[in-house]
């Protein structure tokens, strides 16, 4: 699927999105658009709503109110089409611990009817550096290695959109480079990425657009070409000091 074939100008459209848990409002009338091919990094402190946002976009959690469109599909109406168009890497790997690495990948691949599955597994395993551990049980792997497996699983069905929730947690610098390479290699062309993180330095280095989320809403947006890393850190600290 080429960029020009994709429905509309935006990969993700969020309008007036709110999410409450009891009396606590995690997201407040949030508006956001992500264009095809963007790498948007969202920063924010603990409790800002970052993980809640990714869970909603990943169809794990339902919004309380608002509208969300992903790859042209309405979140409330077409979960299955959205899931085919997204790959998710969370801060916890969320793998089947009683299965081997290759069994985890096969399960995911069959769920999405991945063509030439064994060849595709070899491709992604080579890409993220797990080709030597495919037969090992997941539960004996380190957190960082499990994270590599979760990256392989997320890109296995070659989704055009990646959703990353603190993906660098538990990864060394080499693995962060693997993550960056993996999410940017797609058979369909350039991937669209939405990543949430607390790491200003790594987020700035990876993204081309940045946003700051605080108290459940976007309070700042810019591009990494318009704002260098030191200016981002200063802007973030100033905003956090006022909120």
Range-by-range predicted roles:
Residues 43-45:
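The feature captures the beta-strand-to-loop junction immediately N-terminal to the Walker
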Residues 58:
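Helix-to-loop junction immediately C-terminal to a conserved catalytic motif
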Residues 66-74, 82, 220:
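Conserved ABC transporter NBD signature motif
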Residues 106, 110, 116-133:
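Conserved ABC ATPase "signature" region
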Residues 137-141:
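Conserved ABC ATPase signature
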Residues 162-165:
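Catalytic Walker B motif of ABC-type/P-loop ATPase nucleotide-binding domains
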């Amino acid at each position: 699927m080429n960029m020009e074939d994709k429905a509309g100008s935006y990969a993700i459209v969020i309008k007036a999105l709110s999410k409450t848990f009891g009396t606590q409002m995690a997201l407040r009338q949030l508006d956001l658009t992500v264009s095809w091919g963007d790498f948007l990094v969202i920063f924010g402190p603990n409790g800002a709503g970052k993980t809640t946002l990714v869970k909603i976009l990943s169809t794990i959690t339902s919004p309380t109110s608002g509208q969300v469109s992903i790859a042209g599909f309405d979140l409330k109406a077409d979960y299955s089409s959205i899931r085919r168009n997204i790959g998710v890497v969370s801060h916890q790997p969320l793998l089947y611990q009683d299965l081997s690495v290759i069994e985890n990948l096969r399960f995911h691949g069959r769920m999405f009817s991945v063509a030439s599955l064994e060849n595709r597994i070899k491709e992604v395993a080579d890409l993220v550096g797990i080709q030597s551990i495919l037969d090992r049980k997941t539960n004996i792997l380190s957190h960082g290695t499990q994270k590599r497996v979760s990256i392989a699983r997320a890109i296995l069905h070659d989704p055009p959109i990646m959703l990353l929730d603190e993906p660098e947690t538990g990864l060394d610098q080499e693995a962060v480079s693997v993550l960056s390479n993996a999410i940017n290699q797609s058979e369909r062309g350039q991937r669209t990425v939405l990543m949430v993180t607390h790491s200003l330095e790594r987020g700035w280095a990876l993204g081309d657009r940045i946003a700051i989320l605080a108290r459940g809403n976007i309070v700042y947006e810019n591009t990494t070409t318009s704002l260098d890393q030191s200016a981002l850190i200063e802007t973030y600290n100033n905003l956090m000091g006022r909120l």
